[in-house]
Amino acid sequence: MAFVLSLLMALVLVSYGPGRSLGCYLSEDHMLGARENLRLLARMNRLSPHPCLQDRKDFGLPQEMVEGNQLQKDQAISVLHEMLQQCFNLFYTEHSSAAWNTTLLEQLCTGLQQQLEDLDACLGPVMGEKDSDMGRMGPILTVKKYFQGIHVYLKEKEYSDCAWEIIRVEMMRALSSSTTLQKRLRKMGGDLNSL
């Protein structure tokens, strides 16, 4: 019986391989997905930016927080997940569907959802650490405040084409910053549980 159990455990571990760790691993496929999401956002461009310049706004992207080295492992994973979740929520709306090419929008939402699923393996163990909950909340609240400002802006501009174009460019900045964070996490051994 012990031999059969050992054999089954070995098969499970082998089947996961280096790209499908039981822990928290951002594979090369995850990074390719992040780059593809940026390309999709670039392809969603429908307007020349010139008529929309007067609608520009500084939304206060917490770029230093995301791209810098100030986040600890649990904070970085939580911030990355929150940014992707908020971006998904932004584009997975009725207003967004009316503004963009449906095929590109669906591909973007699918890509964001896949990245979120990849990160869920990382977020589970982190969320169980009660003593660091307060340390994660500050950065997460900063991300939520950033996206709340974006939602308010869209509503104030009545979801105009120019407003969506400004947001598309802003989301390219945000996803580019989150990609930088993902690369930093991956360089630290690839396995986020080892950070």
From Swiss-Prot:
Which keywords does this Swiss-Prot/TrEMBL entry list? Antiviral defense, Cytokine, Disulfide bond, Glycoprotein, Hormone, Pregnancy, Secreted, Signal
The set of disulfide-linked cysteines is C24-C122, C52-C162
Q: Where in the cell is it found?
A: Secreted
Q: What biological processes does GO assign it? A: adaptive immune response; B cell activation involved in immune response; defense response to virus; female pregnancy; humoral immune response; natural killer cell activation involved in immune response; positive regulation of biosynthetic process; response to exogenous dsRNA
Summed up, the tissue specificity of this protein is:
Constitutively and exclusively expressed in the mononuclear cells of the extraembryonic trophectoderm.
Q: Which Pfam families match?
A: Interferon
Stated consequence of mutating V169M: In IFN-tau1C and IFN-tau1D
Q: Glycosylated at which positions?
A: N101
Listed GO MF terms? cytokine activity; hormone activity; type I interferon receptor binding
The UniProt entry, under Gene3D superfamilies, shows: 1.20.1250.10
PROSITE patterns the record matches? INTERFERON_A_B_D (PS00252)
Give the signal peptide range. Answer: 1-23
Q: Name one GO cellular component term.
A: extracellular space
Q: What does this protein do?
A: Paracrine hormone primarily responsible for maternal recognition of pregnancy. Interacts with endometrial receptors, probably type I interferon receptors, and blocks estrogen receptor expression, preventing the estrogen-induced increase in oxytocin receptor expression in the endometrium. This results in the suppression of the pulsatile endometrial release of the luteolytic hormone prostaglandin F2-alpha, hindering the regression of the corpus luteum (luteolysis) and therefore a return to ovarian cyclicity.
Q: What else is known?
A: IFN-tau genes are intronless. They evolved from IFN-omega genes in the ruminantia suborder and have continued to duplicate independently in different lineages of the ruminantia. They code for proteins very similar in sequence but with different biological potency and pattern of expression.
Its family remark reads:
Belongs to the alpha/beta interferon family. IFN-alphaII subfamily.
Q: What is this protein called?
A: Interferon tau-1
Q: What is the lineage of its organism?
A: Eukaryota, Metazoa, Chordata, Craniata, Vertebrata
